[in-house]
């Protein structure tokens, strides 16, 4: 069992149970999945760029991503229907908790001029979205071996019914919010 998974069962769940006055442990919000998405628009011109992005995502997530394709043609971006334009990976279970642990304890402190993450990434239904500008904040990525700096979107899906519950859950997991 991952370190954060044990921490959730032993500390976070009982604390949230008391804080929000739930009747059952099953009502306590929990993280169901984490989705990493990397849009690589430059892949239209060069297929190797997408291969590098997929390689970076494998190192970061620990599992092979699925290549996302364009849903419709857009002439302004020189994109045709079905062109590969990005990659995404969905983490659940132990891999999800291990990634979350690395994100909070190792990767976030490595962000340049980091003062905490903003609280505006909540969607109103208890999910949180976070943008990362550079993939080199993860220790698995070696700076000398990357071809370009790429950002990604990290989407944390929870069972929380409101943003307040989701924020309390993420704060309990030691997410460094600004205020």
From Swiss-Prot:
What superkingdom heads the lineage? Bacteria
Q: Name one GO biological process term.
A: translation
Q: Name one GO molecular function term.
A: structural constituent of ribosome
The record's GO CC annotations read: ribonucleoprotein complex; ribosome
Q: Kindly give the InterPro entries that the UniProt entry links to this protein.
A: Ribosomal_uL5, Ribosomal_uL5_bac-type, Ribosomal_uL5_C, Ribosomal_uL5_CS, Ribosomal_uL5_dom_sf, Ribosomal_uL5_N
Query: What UniProt keywords are attached to this protein's entry?
Result: Ribonucleoprotein, Ribosomal protein, RNA-binding, rRNA-binding, tRNA-binding
Q: How does it assemble?
A: Part of the 50S ribosomal subunit; part of the 5S rRNA/L5/L18/L25 subcomplex. Contacts the 5S rRNA and the P site tRNA. Forms a bridge to the 30S subunit in the 70S ribosome.
Q: Which HAMAP family does the entry link to?
A: Ribosomal_uL5_B (MF_01333_B)
The UniProt entry, under PANTHER family, shows: 60S RIBOSOMAL PROTEIN L11-RELATED (PTHR11994)
- Similarity remark: Belongs to the universal ribosomal protein uL5 family.
Q: Which NCBIfam families match?
A: PRK00010.1
* Role played: This is one of the proteins that bind and probably mediate the attachment of the 5S RNA into the large ribosomal subunit, where it forms part of the central protuberance. In the 70S ribosome it contacts protein S13 of the 30S subunit (bridge B1b), connecting the 2 subunits; this bridge is implicated in subunit movement. Contacts the P site tRNA; the 5S rRNA and some of its associated proteins might help stabilize positioning of ribosome-bound tRNAs.
The molecule here is called: Large ribosomal subunit protein uL5
Species name: Aromatoleum aromaticum (strain DSM 19018 / LMG 30748 / EbN1) (Azoarcus sp. (strain EbN1))
Its lineage reads:
Bacteria, Pseudomonadati, Pseudomonadota, Betaproteobacteria, Rhodocyclales
């Amino acid at each position: 069992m991952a370190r954060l998974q044990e921490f959730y069962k032993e500390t976070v769940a009982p604390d949230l149970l008391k804080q929000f006055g739930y009747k059952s442990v099953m009502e306590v919000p929990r993280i169901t999945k984490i989705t990493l998405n990397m849009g690589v628009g430059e892949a239209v011109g060069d297929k190797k760029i997408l291969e590098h992005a997929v390689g970076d995502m494998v190192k970061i997530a620990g599992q092979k991503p699925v290549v996302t394709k364009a849903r419709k043609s857009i002439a302004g971006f020189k994109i045709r229907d079905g062109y590969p334009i990005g990659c995404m990976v969905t983490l659940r279970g132990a891999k999800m908790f291990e990634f979350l642990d690395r994100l909070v304890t190792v990767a976030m402190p490595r962000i340049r001029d980091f003062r905490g993450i903003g609280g505006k990434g909540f969607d109103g239904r208890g999910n949180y979205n976070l943008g990362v500008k550079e993939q080199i904040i993860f220790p698995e990525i070696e700076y000398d071996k990357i071809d370009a700096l790429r950002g990604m979107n990290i989407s944390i899906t929870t069972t929380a019914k409101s943003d307040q519950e989701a924020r309390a859950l993420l704060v309990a997991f030691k997410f460094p919010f600004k205020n």
